[in-house]
Amino acid sequence: MDSLSENEFRSLLQQGQLTELHRRLDLEKVDSGSAERLALNAQFLFKTGQIESSKAIYTLLANEQGNWSARLNLGHCEKALGNHQQAAVHYRALAEGEDASRQAIAYWSLANMKDRLLDKDDRLKLIEMLALNDLSPAARALANFTLGILEEESGDFGAAFGYLTEANDLIAMNRPWRGDAYQQLIHRLMQFAGEARHRAETNVVRPVFIVGMPRSGTTLVEQILAAHSEVEATDELLYLDQVSRSLEETVGGYAKRIKRLTSEEMRRWQQFYAESSALHCSDTKPVRIDKNPNNFLHVALIMALFPHAKIVNLVRP
């Protein structure tokens, strides 16, 4: 029996401390407990790639009247399993609800499947949604993103650009963007990446990192490599991002901290990555893939911690 309170569980989930959760959870009892605890268990299982187990819990919760969140996450599980038709059934049911903010999430989930599941009636409902004065900025942004995709699919690129611009402007209100600071970070990381391979040695793990801009073909390359009997695909892991955030919070910032990592710190982060990524692996295949397009920002960190790792960078002309 684990000793985790729901507050502790929630906090560890939010911090991405999945290895600590794995250590402290009684995995034989994840399908029992209060509705709140079951939802937390399902989140943990989903985040560690145990989608079928997560789906089973969300199915139980979704049968409870009014459990909107469970129905949404059940759709996410079906999508992750490749069952797009069933995922669409769940999303569509939620889009027919009464709460505009929840409808916006459901419509975006449908649009984000890239299966052209929305029609003219949906477009009109989304436009009506934007006319609501009490629609939250987050929901308004999702509605604009969804309309942007709809207009792009119809060939009206001018209208699509307008909706996408509005959506990004809404997001920027809460997450301001500083292009100059980002460019400075990239230049500092590029200067360091060339010398990073000579700084660390490790036999902990030697993953294959697949990076590149979104929609560049990273998923296809992952599927091709994972067809090999000794290669295992994992998920779009966020552990490098966790390391980068921890380094960013220290004196000097991300780029400078990579350059100043001590041998002890490198061993600690190597072990953290190895243990965390192992949660997504079966232990039967020697090579694991970490496919996350956004990890292009962490190439210098990869070179510092895993000098013998393979990095596949996808560029789409």
Task: For every predicted segment, state its role.
Residues 200-306, 310-314:
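Phosphate-binding active sites in nucleotide-utilizing proteins
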